[in-house]
């Protein structure tokens, strides 16, 4: 086996021409499984590039010859496979489908799975997403405002030619491109959690499942709940918050929280968080010693990674630049 060194962003690439070794790599990154070579064993090779961000593992998997893969129940995870080229004959429990670049396969956590593919003489990589079961069910619970007791029953076919399907695929493909970057933004600690939640939320909207209809039943939050949410944003502004986290902590669904913010404040929870962070950054700038702290350090402390954009929005909000505020009041 050859293994590329960690690229500095948590991404690793594995290359193996040994069947047992390839099985061990896949089992370690994803799930215990069996691999049966249907094509020419003499040219067998497995290549995998993968990284985890929060509760999501995203990888590109390719074999040099046709194989068949079997797993038992995934138990602690849900899974999605998207062939970037060619076809993947696959099943989850009794359900069967042929996954293509236009149709992803979604796997339940409580069913056995099988895959058969990679017969093409050309590279046919598959985007493989492993999603932590608890994280996805918590995400759904936050949006519904009620606990998820039973496993989510997904339909196996996810149409990637619908509007939401294409948009979700674009998000996944964008993340997959970042696997090759040593400075992948999606794997930055302050970005990875919201990015993973965005991907999970998108899947819940794009895929067919037994809770999907309930996602479109808004129940407006009370102003008191909005107040609690604003207090929570104030107290945790330095953390990489998401709407789902805020909704969960104040006990309402994401949709209810969004409606409540729009009705009460005329904005969204995340825009309100940005305002709070901007105000806290200004407070730090006015109190800072320019000799020991700069605009960049303070901006990044409050989650503004693009300092130039921060400076522009700061001036638009307060009428002065961050550097002007940094020099305004002597260090106290």
Curated annotation (Swiss-Prot):
One of its GO terms (molecular function) is sequence-specific DNA binding. Keywords: DNA-binding, Transcription, Transcription regulation. Signal peptide: none annotated. The keyword Protein biosynthesis does not apply. Residues 244-265, 295-318 bind DNA. Transmembrane segments: none annotated. Residues 227-328 form the HTH araC/xylS-type domain. Probably involved in the positive regulation of the thc operon for the degradation of the thiocarbamate herbicide EPTC. This is Probable thc operon regulatory protein. The lineage of its organism: Bacteria, Bacillati, Actinomycetota, Actinomycetes, Mycobacteriales. The gene is thcR.
């Amino acid at each position: 086996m050859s293994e590329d060194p960690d690229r500095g962003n948590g991404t690793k690439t594995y290359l193996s021409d040994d069947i047992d070794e390839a099985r061990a790599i896949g089992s370690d990154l994803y799930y215990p499984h069996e691999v049966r070579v249907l094509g020419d064993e003499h040219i067998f090779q497995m290549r995998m590039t993968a990284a985890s961000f929060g509760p999501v593992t995203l990888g590109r998997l390719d074999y040099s010859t046709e194989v068949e893969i079997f797993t038992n129940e995934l138990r602690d995870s849900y899974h999605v496979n998207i062939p970037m080229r060619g076809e993947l004959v696959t099943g989850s429990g009794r359900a069967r489908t042929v996954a293509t670049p236009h149709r992803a396969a979604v796997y339940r956590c409580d069913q056995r799975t099988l895959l058969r593919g990679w017969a093409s003489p050309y590279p046919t990589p598959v985007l493989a997403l492993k999603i932590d079961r608890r994280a996805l069910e918590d995400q759904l619970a936050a949006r519904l405002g009620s606990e998820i007791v039973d496993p989510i029953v997904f339909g196996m076919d996810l149409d990637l030619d619908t509007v939401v399907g294409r948009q979700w695929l674009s998000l996944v493909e964008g993340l997959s491109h970042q696997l090759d970057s040593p400075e992948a933004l999606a794997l930055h600690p302050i970005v990875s959690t919201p990015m993973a939640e965005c991907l999970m939320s998108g899947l819940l909207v794009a895929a067919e499942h037994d809770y999907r209809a309930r996602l479109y039943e808004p129940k407006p939050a009370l102003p008191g709940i909005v107040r609690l949410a604003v207090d929570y944003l104030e107290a945790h502004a330095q953390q990489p918050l998401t709407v789902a986290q805020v909704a969960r902590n104040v006990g309402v669904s994401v949709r209810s929280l969004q409606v409540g913010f729009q009705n009460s404040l005329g904005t969204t929870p995340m825009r309100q968080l940005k305002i709070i962070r901007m105000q806290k950054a200004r407070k730090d700038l006015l109190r800072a010693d320019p000799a020991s702290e700069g605009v960049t350090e303070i901006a990044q402390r409050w989650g503004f990674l693009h300092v130039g954009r921060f400076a522009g929005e700061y001036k638009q909000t307060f009428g002065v630049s961050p550097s002007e505020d940094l020099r305004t009041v002597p260090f106290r």
